[in-house]
Amino acid sequence: MNRILGMIFLFCLISCYAVDIIQSAKSNGCSVELVKRCQERKCASPCCRDGECHCGCK
């Protein structure tokens, strides 16, 4: 029983890690929190690229 629970926990842990990697790749290498902060900036087209917030991205 403990082995099954351990496998389920390991699967969930790996799944969460994979989702984080995919989201990071989609957001040009920026964390989800940084992307949210960039979107709150008061500029024309805020975005996050290479770990920094930029204005005017297309």
Swiss-Prot record:
Keyword Transferase among UniProt keywords: no
Entry superkingdom: Eukaryota
Keywords associated with the record: Disulfide bond, Secreted, Signal, Toxin
Keyword Coiled coil carried by entry: no
A Gene Ontology cellular-component term: extracellular region
GO molecular function, one term: toxin activity
Tissue spec. comment: Expressed by the venom gland.
Family: Belongs to the scoloptoxin-14 family.
Protein name in UniProt: U-scoloptoxin(14)-Sa1a
Organism: Scolopendra alternans
